[in-house]
């Protein structure tokens, strides 16, 4: 079986890819995983560090051939505001709830959540159901080049004991669900302190 140990960011001048792998956004955070390609073949991804891949990134096989990563269509909400200021306000409300969001000039795209849709409509937003690839904005902990190295968790579900944890949160992750997870650790709960001064 061919192995992949390196990659090229989308837009890098290169030869034409010989195959493609289609993944939703939450399965594009990878380090080591057996990937099933669109042509029916398989390849073992084995990178040194976890990477959050974007649509169009290229995996480099050991023989030099390229495999293109494609963002799969997902069930999403398209959010539009009355104007840009209103859209910024809507983005603030979504960010305050730690939701993954794809923010564009005239719209915001999120995963479907009917509770959030009701909230947004209450704020005057127009919310439409769409099926498109999802490329949410990366958090502040990701590198400027758009790829995450060394800070996030790598969950390898093909090899349940190979975990790359760069910091200890006091719990183990050993899932058998056959997919990767991108975890954001939220530190806004359980830290509500009252400071009383005499």
Curated annotation (Swiss-Prot):
CDD domains: UreE. This is Urease accessory protein UreE. GO terms for cellular component: cytoplasm. Residues 137-198 are annotated as: Disordered. One of its GO terms (molecular function) is nickel cation binding. It comes from Rhizobium johnstonii (strain DSM 114642 / LMG 32736 / 3841) (Rhizobium leguminosarum bv. viciae). Pfam families: UreE_C (PF05194), UreE_N (PF02814). Belongs to the UreE family.
């Amino acid at each position: 079986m061919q192995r992949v140990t390196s990659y090229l960011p989308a837009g890098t001048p290169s030869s034409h890819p010989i195959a493609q792998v289609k993944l939703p956004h939450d399965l594009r955070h990878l380090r080591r995983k057996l990937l099933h390609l669109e042509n029916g073949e398989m390849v073992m991804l084995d990178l040194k560090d976890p990477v959050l891949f974007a649509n169009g990134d290229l995996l480099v096989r050991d023989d030099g051939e390229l495999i293109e990563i494609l963002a799969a269509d997902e069930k999403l909400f398209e959010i539009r505001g009355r104007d840009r200021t209103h859209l910024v306000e809507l983005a603030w409300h979504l960010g305050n709830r730690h939701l993954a969001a794809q923010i564009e000039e005239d719209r915001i795209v999120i995963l479907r959540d009917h509770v959030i849709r009701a909230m947004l409509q209450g704020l005057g937003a127009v919310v439409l159901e769409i099926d498109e690839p999802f490329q949410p904005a990366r958090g502040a902990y990701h590198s400027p080049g758009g790829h995450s190295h060394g800070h996030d968790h790598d969950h390898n579900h093909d090899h349940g004991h190979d975990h790359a944890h760069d910091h200890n949160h006091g719990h183990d992750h050993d899932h058998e669900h056959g997919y990767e997870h991108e975890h954001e650790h939220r530190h806004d709960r359980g830290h509500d302190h009252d400071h009383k001064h005499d």
